[in-house]
Amino acid sequence: MAVRPLRAIYQIDPYLFRDSDGRGWGTLDGITEKLDYLQWLGISHVWLLPFYCNAGRDGGYDVTDHYRIDPRLGDQAAFQRLVDAADARGIGIIVELVMQHTASAHPWFVAAQQGDPAWRRWYLWSDHMPDDGLQPMFPPIEASVWTWDAEAGAFNRHMFYWHEPDLDLAHAPVREELLQVMTFWLQRGVAGFRVDAVPYMVERARHADPRDDGLWLLEAMRATADAQQPGLPLIGEADVRASHYGDFLCRGRRLSHLLDFHLNNHFFLALARGDASEVARGMAEYGPHAPPDTRIAWLRNNDELDLEQLEPDEREAVMERFAPERGMRIYGRGIRRRLAPMLGGDIAWQAMAWAALLSLGQVPVVRYGEEIGLGDCLELPERNAVRMPMHWHDGPGAGFTDQPRHAWRAPPADGPYGYRTVNVEAQRATPDSLLLRVRELLQQRNAHPVLQQGPHTLDPPSPALLMLRFGEAPHQALALINFGDNPVEVDVPLHGPLHTLVRHGAKLQGRRCYLQGHGYAWLAAEGA
């Protein structure tokens, strides 16, 4: 079977999307119930956040069994129903591959703690506190990446939380297990993997073989994927400099795609300053071996908005605009808010952000709920603030659950982002809603392959205007996106008759386009 092209990915937290059995948790069958909605929206792939058995302390990333599904979500039969139903609608299922660490409750680690020498080799230990310069991912929650384990009588390394010990991928049996986990899920029909914490995986592989700085591990993973389905997407989480993207991709011999943290940072700097030139600057900083269609773009994800790739003054500019209160910030580097509250609930501004994102020539990710402007809950700890249930309608439980009294995390009813105001059902029936604008953009992008190509950045008459040209004459298209609050106007540099693909807050008169603040337009030369 040919690999399905990545056109648009929809990220789902299975615990928070749709409860099909009234127990208060999302389920895999609940996701299956909503596949028609995703097909209507224009989605080609679903990215499932972790659904494995886990210790319940880190959103499913603290895995206790890589082969079993959390029984609260369903079982293998439910997973197969989801895969088959999605495939029937032309949608592929991408799953998380979390093999840089496990939960401390994982049987492998428990055996290691108890002194089994074979399992001890699977993790990283030290008799003393190492002075290795490694910094924890979650300061000040974690003061160090090494924690004393009294039962094991040694320090244990964890790049993430203390209860998520690092696997030692320098140890051959661990690498063999990684490939076995991949094969297990490939044989059950998954359409790709999102690989968690890639730089830390290759860092340990380098200790077994320094060749290519440990990146050979990704080639072994590519070979395993290709043995089941050649060209299968391997999407890497690697928050590295853009100039290093090509090393992780290696023209498809390693990962197929990378999550583009670099441009995501520049994108939010542009939103904060109302200056589209920050996007253009970010687009110009890639190496020659990371074309746009190998990069994954998003607005917000399951975690904090991590701004580490910006300079300190740039980071502070984004913080001041979108996280002015201390409780909105986290880890000294990020923002724990969803997009809609960051942009003040402004539908035009949110839609403009989507128009810009979908103009980058990258593979876009829609996080569940972002298409309707789902809110956050700053009362929840850490990154949980952005992990709220989906709103399907304005009735009790918001359609997330039919038993709201049993809801694990209750959706808010009132306020600007409550389900009585923000929900799918209402927006599907409301002309010019955020949902219908996002759908229009996705559908037009799917219908016009020229918009999926890597664009050429043009010099605009105003720094607020992002001006991107796609394709070659006579089959060309143009994206015009106004990041600023004030109107701008521009001559359209396309030849031949013009056709409007998408237009909001924009007016075309002859060959001149007038854009209001946060207005946008996609134009095409006839035939594009």
What name fits each language-model region?
Residues 1-496, 502-528:
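Active-site and adjacent substrate-binding regions of carbohydrate-active enzymes
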